[in-house]
């Protein structure tokens, strides 16, 4: 994930954060850190870090594990947590004191099993907001060694924060979304309606440009260019997890799959960058048959995010195929 972070730190992907005001040419805020030692669930709960790879703007405090927003805007966060043998894993992405935004979870406790779970989300932050990782406080939860990585960076500064740095120049093209689903889904051969339906979402975290329809589960490209997409899903016990990232009607771009028969809840993540034309649709397709499903609850196991990395202002052409009827 660090390579992805460093690759996206160009000015077209995120405007770097510096002192706002006259003479400031860019807005920059980015960090990436790691914890290299185990951590068991305690009353403290905050995951702290002992290794910092990047801390542009100095907004991340490794000793407390907290990122503090200095420039309001939309930020992309990702984290990976390793599970200790004989322990369960439950790590939450938290905003401010107790606003859980997304969750990484694995309750597989086989002897000697070393596993990891990842999660990502985009959040709209105001000045002074904090974002951190919380390990479940019960003693049956723990991070293994190496424990975790945590990264985040400013994708789009708010217009008011951006104005002093940009002056009278035309505003940059912007398109970004992040959504979560708090309900599980279970496939059924007897279910009515079409099989190829986009996965719908009930929680909208960010929707800059209004290009994502959460209820329909479809992102529609308004600005041609290169987009980054990531998605994470929880696996239902004893069910097969099969979810595809689709472009337009039937173009499979990436896939999550797990047919393990475990009765424990687990998670899978995937990400990809796609070139899109105006009118292209991107959505998630869950295999809707008996024996398939995906797990979520109020902790938001299921997430879907995407944002414009580099616009292609010269692109032209007719709109692409429409997504399936919902």
From Swiss-Prot:
Its main location: secreted. It is found in: Secreted. Homomultimer. Forms trimers, hexamers and high molecular weight oligomers. It comes from Mus musculus. This is Complement C1q tumor necrosis factor-related protein 4. May be involved in the regulation of the inflammatory network. The role as pro- or anti-inflammatory seems to be context dependent. Seems to have some role in regulating food intake and energy balance when administered in the brain. This effect is sustained over a two-day period, and it is accompanied by decreased expression of orexigenic neuropeptides in the hypothalamus 3 hours post-injection. Disulfide bonds: none annotated. The keyword Repeat applies. Residues 164-193 are annotated as: Disordered. The gene is C1qtnf4. GO terms for biological process: cell surface receptor signaling pathway via STAT; gene expression; positive regulation of interleukin-6 production; positive regulation of interleukin-6-mediated signaling pathway; positive regulation of non-canonical NF-kappaB signal transduction; positive regulation of tumor necrosis factor production; reduction of food intake in response to dietary excess.
């Amino acid at each position: 994930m660090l390579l992805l972070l460093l690759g996206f730190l160009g000015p077209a992907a995120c405007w770097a954060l510096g002192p706002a005001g006259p003479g400031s040419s860019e807005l920059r805020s980015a960090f990436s850190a790691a914890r290299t030692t185990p951590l068991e669930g305690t009353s403290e709960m905050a995951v702290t870090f002992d290794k910092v790879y990047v801390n542009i703007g100095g907004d991340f405090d490794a000793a407390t594990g907290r990122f503090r927003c200095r420039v309001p805007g939309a930020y992309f966060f990702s984290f990976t947590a390793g599970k200790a043998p004989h322990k369960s894993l439950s790590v939450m992405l938290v905003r401010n004191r107790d606003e859980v935004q997304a969750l990484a979870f694995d309750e597989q406790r086989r002897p000697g099993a070393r596993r990891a779970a990842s999660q990502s989300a985009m959040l709209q932050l105001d000045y002074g907001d904090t974002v951190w990782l919380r390990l479940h406080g019960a003693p049956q939860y723990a991070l293994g060694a190496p424990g975790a990585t945590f990264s985040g960076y400013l994708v789009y500064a708010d217009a008011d924060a951006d104005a002093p740095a940009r002056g009278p120049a035309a505003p940059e093209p912007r398109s970004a979304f992040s959504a979560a689903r708090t309900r599980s889904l279970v496939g059924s051969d007897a279910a009515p309606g079409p099989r190829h339906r986009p996965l719908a979402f009930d929680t909208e975290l960010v929707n800059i440009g209004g290009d994502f329809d959460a209820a329909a589960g479809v992102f529609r490209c308004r600005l041609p260019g290169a987009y980054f997409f990531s998605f994470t899903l929880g696996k239902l016990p004893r069910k097969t997890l099969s979810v595809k990232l689709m472009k337009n009607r039937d173009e499979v771009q990436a896939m999550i799959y797990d047919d393990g028969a475990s009765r424990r809840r687990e998670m899978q993540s995937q990400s990809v960058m796609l070139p899109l034309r105006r009118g292209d649709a991107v959505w998630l397709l869950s295999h809707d048959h008996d024996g398939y499903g995906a797990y979520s609850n109020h902790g938001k196991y299921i997430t879907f995010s995407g944002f414009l990395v580099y616009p292609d202002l010269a692109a032209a052409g007719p709109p692409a195929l429409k997504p399936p009827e919902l």
